[in-house]
Amino acid sequence: MVDVSPERFEELVDDALDAIPDELAALVHNLVVLVEEEPPPGEAQDLLGLYDGSTLGLDAAGYLPDRIFLYRRPLLDYCRTEAELVREVRVTVVHELGHHFGLDDARLHELGWA
């Protein structure tokens, strides 16, 4: 387990988002990324991230943004070093963003983002 402050964790998330290529980021609309300490009751407590929304192009609500949740405590527990945490935050951001673009877990695994 690695331990970083909530502020440092937010920096790592911001860095992961900044690393998304501009061409891809330009396609993202009505999406927010939120950091929570742990998954909600009813979800696996080792869940690293979660996409909550509709697939891009299939906007059902039109008003409320789709959401990517990153769960700080499970990510910290999963990683032994800050370098591992940097990588895992990036992988989790890309994985959940992939769901926004309609990719399922099997395809994300094939692409190395699972």
What kind of region is each of these model predictions?
Residues 110-114:
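Short hydrophobic/aromatic patches at helix-to-coil boundaries
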Residues 1-88, 100, 106-109:
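Active-site rim/adjacent substrate-binding subdomains
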